[in-house]
Each structure stands twice: as structure tokens, then as C-alpha cells.
């Protein structure tokens, strides 16, 4: 095993702009060098530090229309409210699968959670801002989803529409199949619909570091592609290897 030392990262901002999408800013703070255990040698300067936080800025040049896929979930709902509060036009798309799984498992939230209709009505009452809710199964209603895209013409989609529990994904054969079919099918349909619509839509997909495994690298996980030295001295540029520990992580 070779110990590879990644250079320290200095504080900087990553700013991406588009004529159809407002600025996205990510802050990265200074970090100490990181030791990474690897069965091969990493070369070049392609080892990048992970970005700990990405934040959507205030609307520039008017509000944007944002689809929040899976917007009824624990992360999707506050994200939808945050974007609405910033002045964006938000459309929540959700099939309420999280609630259905809770019923299946005989579980419930520590605090009562109202229906999506009540939630958006309360948000309107409290803030005067409209959030639209559409009940839709993204995995199985592709044509309807494509029509919604063509009708609403969103600038951005934030994608939370996936079965989100690693333990549930390993519970039995049915939950394994559901996790794979739902998570991969929903993501594939979202990407296909964007392409088929012909619209300039940005997709933000929420993942997990568990794709690369927990506690295996001994340090920061390099982002994206890395240069490696293969046995025999041959160099190759590869995507950082995945090491998922569950069906859920393998779909992310």
C-alpha cells in the first residue's frame, strides 16, 4: 500500500454561471495535507479536495423556476422552502414514497408531518409565496414528467427523488429491487427528459460519500478523475473507484 500525500488546499470560491441559471457558489476552507492509502500510485495534479457545501445564491436577473424532485422528504422540503424564500418559483414533485415506507415499517416522525397540500398552503399563509406540489412517480410516469417539463420550463432541477435508507435497501429482496429500480430509474428518466425536452436545464443530484465506502481511504476522497500508475509503469486517468457498502449506496 502506498501512502499518497495530497497538497493542502487554500480557501477559494467556485463560481459557475449560465445565461439560463443563476450563480452557484461553493466555499472551500484551508485544509492540512491528507494521507491517502492506495494500492496504486496517484500521479499528476488531479487530486482535488471535496467541496463541503454548495449554496444557491440570491436570484440574479429575476427569479428562476426550480423543480425539487422528492420535495416532500426530510431534505427536499426545507430545500424547497429555502429556494422559495430566496424568490425562486418552486415546483415540488413527489410520490410520497417516504410516507408509504414509514407506514410499511410501522414507523412515524417524532413530530407530526402534515400532508403536502397543507404544508404548501401553510407556507403561502405565512409568507405569501406560492410553492406548487405535483404528485408524480418519476420512475413510472416518464411521459407525464416530460409534459410537465415542457409546460413549466424549469431552469434547474434539484434531485432528491430516491429511496434514502441504506438499511431499508438491504432488508429483503423486494426492498433491494425497489431501491435499484426507483433510484436508478428516476435519475435516468430525469436525465432523458431533460435531453428530450431540448431545454437548457441544470440538474443538481444529491449523492453520498458512502458511494466510495466509509473509512477506507484514510483521508479526503479525491473528486472526479485521478491519474494512476498501473503495474508495469503505465499511466492511466480513471474515475475514482467506488466502494459502496449497500444497495442504496450502489445506486447513488
Features from the language model and the residues they span:
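Generic extreme N-terminus detector
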Residues: 4-6, 51, 60
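Intrinsically disordered, low-complexity terminal segments enriched in Ser/Thr
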Residues: 47-49
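N-terminal chloroplast transit peptides
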Residues: 1-44
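Glycine-centered signal
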Residues: 23, 27, 51-54, 248
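N-terminal Rossmann-like NAD(P)+-binding domain of SDR-like oxidoreductases, especially those catalyzing
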Residues: 57-252
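Short acidic, low-complexity intrinsically disordered linear motifs used
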Residues: 9-12, 51-55
Amino acid at each position: 500500500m502506498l501512502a499518497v500525500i495530497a497538497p493542502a488546499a487554500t480557501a477559494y470560491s467556485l463560481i459557475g454561471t449560465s445565461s439560463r441559471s443563476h450563480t452557484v457558489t461553493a466555499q472551500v476552507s484551508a485544509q492540512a495535507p491528507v494521507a491517502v492509502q492506495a494500492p496504486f500510485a496517484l500521479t499528476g495534479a488531479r487530486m482535488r479536495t471535496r467541496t463541503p457545501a454548495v449554496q444557491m445564491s440570491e436570484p440574479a436577473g429575476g427569479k428562476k423556476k426550480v423543480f425539487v424532485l422528492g420535495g416532500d422528504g426530510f431534505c427536499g422540503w426545507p430545500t424547497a422552502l429555502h429556494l422559495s424564500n430566496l424568490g425562486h418559483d418552486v415546483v415540488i414533485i413527489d410520490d410520497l414514497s417516504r410516507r408509504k415506507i414509514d407506514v410499511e415499517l410501522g414507523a412515524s416522525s417524532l413530530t407530526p408531518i402534515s400532508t403536502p397540500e397543507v404544508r404548501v398552503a401553510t407556507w403561502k399563509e405565512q409568507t405569501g409565496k406560492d410553492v406548487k406540489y405535483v404528485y408524480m412517480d418519476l420512475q413510472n410516469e416518464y411521459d407525464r414528467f416530460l409534459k410537465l417539463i415542457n409546460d413549466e420550463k424549469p431552469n434547474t432541477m434539484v434531485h432528491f427523488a430516491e429511496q434514502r435508507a441504506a438499511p431499508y435497501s438491504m432488508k429483503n429482496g423486494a426492498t433491494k429491487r425497489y431501491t435499484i429500480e426507483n433510484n436508478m430509474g428516476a435519475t435516468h428518466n430525469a436525465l432523458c427528459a431533460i435531453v428530450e425536452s431540448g431545454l437548457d436545464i441544470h440538474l443538481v443530484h444529491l449523492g453520498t460519500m458512502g458511494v466510495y465506502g466509509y473509512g477506507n481511504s484514510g483521508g479526503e476522497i479525491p473528486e472526479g478523475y485521478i491519474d494512476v500508475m498501473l503495474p508495469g509503469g503505465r499511466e492511466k486517468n480513471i474515475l475514482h473507484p467506488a466502494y459502496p457498502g449497500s444497495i442504496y449506496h450502489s445506486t447513488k
